[in-house]
Design a protein with these regions (language model features):
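S-adenosyl-L-methionine
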Residues: 1
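Short "lid" loop at the C-terminus of a central beta-strand within the Rossmann-like core
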Residues: 13-15, 48-53
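A short SAM/SAH-binding and catalytic strip from SAM-dependent methyltransferases
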Residues: 5-25
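Charged helix-capping and loop-helix junction motifs
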Residues: 22-31, 61-65
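Conserved acidic residues
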Residues: 4-5, 41
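Conserved beta-strand signature within the Rossmann-like core of class I S-adenosyl-L-methionine
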Residues: 31-49
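Short alpha-helix
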Residues: 59-80
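Core SAM-dependent methyltransferase catalytic element
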Residues: 80-99
C-alpha cells in the first residue's frame, strides 16, 4: 500500500467506456473513497459538469457540480470547487484533510 501527501487526478474521471451513468458513479465514488484513505493532505480532481448528468456517445462524462460537492462534503468534509471562466464546464474539486 502507499500513502501520499497529495493525490491529483486530471481527466481520470472524464471518460467512461459505457453509457451507464450509475456504473460510472459507483466507480467514481469507490475510487475517491479508496484514494482518500491514502492521502495525508489533500485530494484534487477535475470533472466536466452540466445541468444534465450524462455520458456522451464519445464516452465523455458530464456530472452535476452540486451532486459532487454534496458527495464530497458528506464523505470527506469541506470541498472547494474551482472554476476557470475560460473553461466553465471543467470544474476542479479540492478536498483538504487540514484547514
Amino acid at each position: 500500500t502507499f500513502t501520499a501527501e497529495f493525490i491529483i487526478m486530471s481527466g481520470t474521471y472524464n471518460f467512461f467506456p459505457s453509457k451507464d451513468f450509475n456504473s460510472w458513479r459507483l466507480y467514481f465514488c469507490k475510487s475517491l473513497k479508496t484514494l482518500w484513505s491514502k492521502t495525508t493532505c489533500a485530494m484534487i480532481f477535475n470533472l466536466q459538469t452540466s445541468d444534465q448528468e450524462k455520458i456522451t456517445d464519445g464516452g465523455i462524462v458530464y456530472t452535476s457540480k452540486e451532486e459532487i460537492e454534496n458527495f464530497c462534503k458528506s464523505n470527506f468534509g469541506n470541498v472547494k470547487a474551482v472554476i476557470n471562466p475560460a473553461i466553465p464546464k471543467d470544474v476542479t474539486f479540492v478536498i483538504k484533510k487540514w484547514s
